[in-house]
C-alpha cells in the first residue's frame, strides 16, 4: 500500500481515524468489486468525501488535492455484511461450563465484552450486521439495542447494527430461556416480555413489545435447534396461525422477519406465511426450495456455525451431538439444491457459535459447495443489503452511497480466502483499520466458555 500527498489524520479516543468533512480521499487498487458486477473492475478507484462515495470507476482521474491511498495488488470492495450475528453473546466453549456461566455472569460484563466483539467484527471487514438475538437467563436487558446505539453515537467502534432484541419462540422451544432448567428455577414461566408466546395474540404482543424496545428486525424460532437441550432439531414450534400473526404484525410495523428454522415442515409453513428469510434451513427439501424461489424468500445458510460445532463436537452432550451431525449431514445437499434452483442467498454466519471476527471463513465454505467466488462476494454485499432493506445507502460501490469500503490482498475470485485477510476498513468515510489487525483479546481468539443462550 502506498499513501501519497499529505494525509492529515485525527486519532479519536477510540482509535478510529477520521478525516475532515471537506477532505477528498482517493482509494486505488489493481482490482475492484463493485457489489453487483459479474467480474472484477480493473484499476479501480473510489473517491470519498465526508461519509459518501462521490465517484467510482476504472482509471478515474483523481481530483487535485485529494489524498491518495494506493493499495497496489489488492481488491477494493463494499464493506461486507453479515446477516446472522449475535454480537452480545460469547461463542461456545465447553457446553456444561456455559450452562453454569449463564447463571453466574453479570449482564453488564457481557455488555462490556460485546464492545470487544463488535470491534473484532468491523476490523474483519464487516461494516454492517443484522444481529438476530440477544437474551440472558433471568434478565430483560436489551444489550443489543444499547450496543447499536453506542456505535451509532460514536462511543464504541463497531459495525452498523440492525438488531432483533430477544427473538420470539414457543414455550419449551429453542428460544425459551428457561428450557432445560428445573421447573420454576427462575420463579416464573417466561412470557411475551421474554419473547415466549403460545397464541397469535401473544405473538402480536411480543412483536409490539420488541419494536417498542428498539428492534429493527423480528426474529423467531419456528423449529427446534441444535444447541437447545429440550427439543428435536426439526420439529415445528409455531403453529401456522402464530406464524401468520408474526408476519402480519411485523410487516404492519415495517419490520422484516427472519426465522430460525432447520425443519422442512416449519420452513414450508414459514415461507407460506411470508417471512423474509430462513436462517439455517438444514433439512429443506426441493419442493420447499421451489416454494422459496417462487416467494422470493432469502436463505441464510450459516455454514460456519455447523462447521465450527462439528470441529468441537466432543464439547457437546450426546443428544446435541446427534442433532448437530444430522443438521450438518443435511445442509450440504440443501445448499447445493438452493444454488441450482437460483434461490436468493444471503451471507450470514451465526457468529457467537464460533469466535467473533472469523466471519469471512463462510466464503470458502460457500465456494466449497459450488458457489462461484464472485457470487459469494455478492451475498455479503448487494444481496445482504437488499435483505436488510438498506440497499439504497449501502452494499455497493456507487456514487452517493455511504463510504463503507474495504481492501483485501490479491484477487478474491482466484483465492477466496483473501476475504479473511482484509487489510483496510472504512466505515462511512472513517478509517477503522489500515494495516495489520491489533492482537485480539483472549475473549475473541481463544476458547472461553460461551455464556450465551442457544443460538444455532
Annotate each language-model stretch with its function.
Residues 100-102, 252-256, 316, 326-412:
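His/Asp/Glu-enriched, well-ordered alpha-helical/loop segment
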Residues 113-141, 157-167, 215-228, 256, ...:
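Divalent metal-dependent hydrolysis catalytic cores, especially in the metallo-beta-lactamase
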Residues 91-94, 144, 173-175, 228-230, ...:
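Histidine/acidic-residue-rich catalytic or RNA/ligand-binding cores of hydrolases
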Residues 88-110, 171-191, 226-238, 295-328:
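Active-site gating loops and adjacent loop-to-helix segments of metal-dependent hydrolytic enzymes
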Residues 32, 36-77, 100:
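Histidine-rich, glycine-flanked metal-binding segment
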Residues 74-153, 174-175, 241, 265, ...:
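Metal-associated gating/positioning segment near the N- to mid-region
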Residues 146, 201-299, 326-345, 392:
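Histidine/acidic residue-rich metal-binding segments in metalloenzymes
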Amino acid at each position: 500500500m502506498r499513501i501519497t500527498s499529505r494525509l492529515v489524520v485525527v486519532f479519536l479516543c477510540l482509535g478510529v481515524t477520521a478525516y475532515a468533512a471537506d477532505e477528498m480521499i482517493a482509494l486505488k487498487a489493481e482490482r475492484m468489486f463493485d457489489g453487483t458486477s459479474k467480474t472484477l473492475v480493473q484499476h479501480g478507484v473510489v473517491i470519498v468525501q465526508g461519509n459518501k462515495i462521490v465517484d467510482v470507476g476504472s482509471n478515474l482521474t483523481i481530483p487535485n488535492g485529494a489524498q491518495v491511498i494506493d493499495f497496489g495488488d489488492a481488491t477494493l470492495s463494499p464493506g461486507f455484511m453479515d446477516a446472522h450475528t449475535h454480537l452480545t453473546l460469547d461463542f461456545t466453549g465447553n457446553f456444561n461450563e456455559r450452562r453454569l456461566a449463564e447463571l453466574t455472569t453479570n449482564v453488564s460484563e457481557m455488555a462490556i465484552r460485546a464492545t470487544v466483539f463488535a470491534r473484532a467484527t468491523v476490523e474483519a471487514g464487516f461494516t454492517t450486521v443484522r444481529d438476530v438475538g440477544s437474551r440472558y437467563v433471568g434478565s430483560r436487558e436489551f444489550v443489543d439495542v444499547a450496543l447499536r446505539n453506542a456505535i451509532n453515537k460514536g462511543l464504541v467502534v463497531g459495525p452498523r447494527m440492525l438488531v432483533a432484541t430477544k427473538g420470539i419462540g414457543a414455550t419449551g422451544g429453542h428460544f425459551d430461556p428457561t428450557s432445560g432448567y428445573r421447573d420454576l428455577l427462575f420463579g416464573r414461566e417466561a412470557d411475551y416480555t421474554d419473547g415466549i408466546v403460545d397464541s397469535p395474540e401473544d405473538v402480536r404482543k411480543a412483536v409490539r413489545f420488541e419494536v417498542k424496545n428498539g428492534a429493527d428486525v423480528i426474529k423467531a424460532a419456528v423449529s427446534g435447534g441444535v444447541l437447545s437441550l429440550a427439543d428435536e432439531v426439526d420439529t415445528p414450534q409455531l403453529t401456522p396461525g402464530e406464524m401468520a400473526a408474526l408476519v402480519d404484525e411485523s410487516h404492519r410495523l415495517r419490520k422484516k422477519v427472519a426465522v430460525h428454522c432447520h425443519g422442512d415442515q416449519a420452513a414450508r409453513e414459514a415461507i407460506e406465511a411470508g417471512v423474509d428469510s430462513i436462517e439455517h434451513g438444514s433439512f429443506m427439501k426441493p419442493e420447499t426450495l421451489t416454494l422459496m424461489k417462487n416467494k422470493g424468500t432469502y436463505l441464510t445458510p450459516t455454514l460456519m456455525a455447523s462447521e465450527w460445532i462439528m470441529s468441537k463436537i466432543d464439547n457437546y452432550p450426546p443428544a446435541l451431538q446427534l442433532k448437530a451431525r444430522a443438521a450438518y449431514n443435511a445442509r450440504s445437499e440443501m445448499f447445493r439444491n438452493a444454488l441450482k434452483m437460483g434461490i436468493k442467498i444471503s451471507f450470514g454466519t451465526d457468529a457467537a457459535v464460533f469466535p467473533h471476527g472469523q466471519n469471512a471463513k463462510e466464503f470458502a465454505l460457500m465456494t466449497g459447495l459450488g458457489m462461484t467466488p464472485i457470487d459469494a462476494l455478492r451475498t455479503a454485499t448487494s444481496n445482504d443489503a437488499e435483505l436488510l432493506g438498506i440497499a439504497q445507502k449501502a452494499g455497493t460501490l456507487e456514487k452517493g452511497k455511504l463510504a463503507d469500503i474495504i481492501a483485501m490482498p490479491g484477487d478474491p475470485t482466484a483465492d477466496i480466502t483473501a476475504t479473511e485477510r482484509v487489510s483496510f476498513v472504512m466505515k462511512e468515510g472513517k478509517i477503522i483499520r489500515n494495516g495489520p489487525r491489533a492482537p485480539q483479546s483472549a475473549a475473541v481468539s481463544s476458547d472461553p466458555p460461551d455464556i450465551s443462550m442457544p443460538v444455532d
